[in-house]
Amino acid sequence: MEFYRRCFEQNLKYAVIFEDNVIVKDHQLYDQIQSVIDVMGDNFEMCFFHCLSRYPDRRENGLERVKWISSTKCYLIHVENMKQYYKYFFPIDNHVDMKHEDIIAEGARVYYKDMRKYMRIDRGKGSTIGHSDWGKKGYFSRQYPNVKTDVLIRGY
């Protein structure tokens, strides 16, 4: 969450977050990210370029709008737009990469664009945050507690 605070203080318009296990395979990744900015302008809060799984909503401007998404390996934020949603990350009562469902529920426009062609994830080491199935194998979301995992689209 420190990252958001620094972006706000620096008055950035956009920021891209890469986790430390993202490996850029093709520098066209940056052109693809710029194309999202060019198309979406100020009309989004976040766009993910990696996910383990997602619950799609609809297509908009060549991107997939999502109701829910997991994993935060690489994504773009519209810094000014995210200011109104920052408070919904708190309290941190779930993994940060799972808190995005809370800002989506509050109206954040969150998208996905598959960028596996341009990057890969080094999975040589295990996750440091751990994950849970909440004791229910079909459960994936607090916002959609009665929706089963078969609606999810798997990422990479």
Specify the residue positions occupied by each region the protein language model found.
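An acidic/histidine-cluster motif and surrounding catalytic segment
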Residues: 1-18, 22-156
